[in-house]
């Protein structure tokens, strides 16, 4: 590992520990020439996931797009940024665990709606209206009716 201060290529590891999310190893190194310390991270290389858009174009999965969509849907709702990040992390983790290399954008949208339905119905309807491209008020009413019906069925099962 090349020292960022003097460029010398030999160092010793002074400390090594796992990051909080256990996805990387943080190493404190000391240059054997200038004796300065620096930090490096070692992590597993992610397999890039391609998202197949509605128009059949493909682009690399970008978690920030999920976060941005959730932030808009949850605006002025009692949903914390931690919850939003958690939803995005769960979706990314699911795709990585399923070892998907290509995924339709519809699949990601459905996962997001599933999570939103569990935490906030208003945010769910907001997201669904954009994702499913609601054309008029009747589409909103239909979605809300379905949501209320699902909620009623859930109470009966309990």
UniProtKB/Swiss-Prot annotation:
The keyword Aminoacyl-tRNA synthetase does not apply. A zinc finger (unnamed) spans 3-34. It holds the Pfam family ATP-cone. Residues 49-139 form the ATP-cone domain. PROSITE patterns: ATP_CONE (PS51161). Keywords: ATP-binding, DNA-binding, Metal-binding, Nucleotide-binding, Repressor, Transcription, Transcription regulation, Zinc, Zinc-finger. Binds 1 zinc ion. Its cofactor is Zn(2+). One of its GO terms (biological process) is negative regulation of DNA-templated transcription. GO terms for molecular function: ATP binding; DNA binding; zinc ion binding. Negatively regulates transcription of bacterial ribonucleotide reductase nrd genes and operons by binding to NrdR-boxes. Belongs to the NrdR family. This is Transcriptional repressor NrdR. It comes from Clostridium novyi (strain NT).
